[in-house]
């Protein structure tokens, strides 16, 4: 109670939380409550409080009329097995293993991973590790063989981070300061090595039945 009163009375204050409160049973509620507290205490988007970032590009604050948002839809569908609600067109990764191992219509039988290791980074990791072994086919775009990619039928190596230019569109959405840094490649890339975008475009064409010789 004392902490709540001090927070409400403080001239400047901010409540902040990310992965620790978001990867639990009521993670969405926790994330919403954090922002609700900042709003109710008058600490939203003001100096000393919880401010909106305005990155150079890639976010809701970089386009459209300032101060107005259109919101987003959620709950338009549910996962097949445990009926977990959709949010922003995605389902919780906690449902992935059960969607692979549970027979029935629309059962997941194939998987593509890109530079990730969900066997270590997601809930029900042991169950997911076992489930990946049951897939009919799995492709990983990665430069490492790790706990996840070891299950892949094919590993397609993309250029390393030192061989690519870089502008961090995603993380600047959470930046403490509004910055824009662009990095040129450190190493010269082999021209015969396709970029991740080229690999994904080629795979998309193959998945659409255009064949392995399709031109992305």
Predicted regions and their residues:
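Active-site-adjacent alpha/beta core region of enzyme catalytic domains
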Residues: 51
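Non-catalytic alpha/beta scaffold blocks inside enzyme catalytic domains
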Residues: 1-36, 40-46, 54-216
């Amino acid at each position: 109670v004392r902490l709540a009163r001090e927070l409400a009375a403080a001239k400047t204050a901010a409540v902040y939380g990310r992965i620790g409160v978001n990867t639990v049973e009521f993670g969405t509620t926790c994330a919403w409550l954090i922002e609700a507290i900042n709003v109710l205490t008058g600490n939203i988007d003001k100096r000393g409080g919880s401010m909106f970032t305005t990155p150079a590009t890639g976010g809701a604050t970089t386009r459209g009329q300032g101060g107005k948002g259109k919101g987003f839809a959620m709950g338009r569908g549910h996962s097949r097995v445990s009926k977990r609600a959709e949010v922003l067109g995605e389902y919780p990764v906690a449902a992935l293993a059960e969607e692979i191992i549970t027979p029935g219509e629309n059962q997941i039988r194939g998987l593509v991973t890109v530079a990730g290791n969900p066997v270590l980074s997601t809930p029900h990791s042991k169950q997911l590790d076992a489930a990946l072994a049951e897939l009919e086919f799995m492709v990983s775009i990665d430069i490492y063989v790790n706990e996840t990619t070891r299950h892949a039928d094919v590993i397609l190596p993309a250029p390393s981070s030192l061989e690519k230019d870089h502008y961090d569109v995603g993380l600047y959405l959470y930046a403490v300061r509004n910055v824009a840094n662009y990095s040129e490649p450190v190493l010269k890339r082999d021209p015969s090595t396709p970029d991740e975008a080229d690999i994904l475009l080629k795979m998309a064409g193959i998945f659409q039945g255009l064949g392995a010789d399709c031109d992305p």
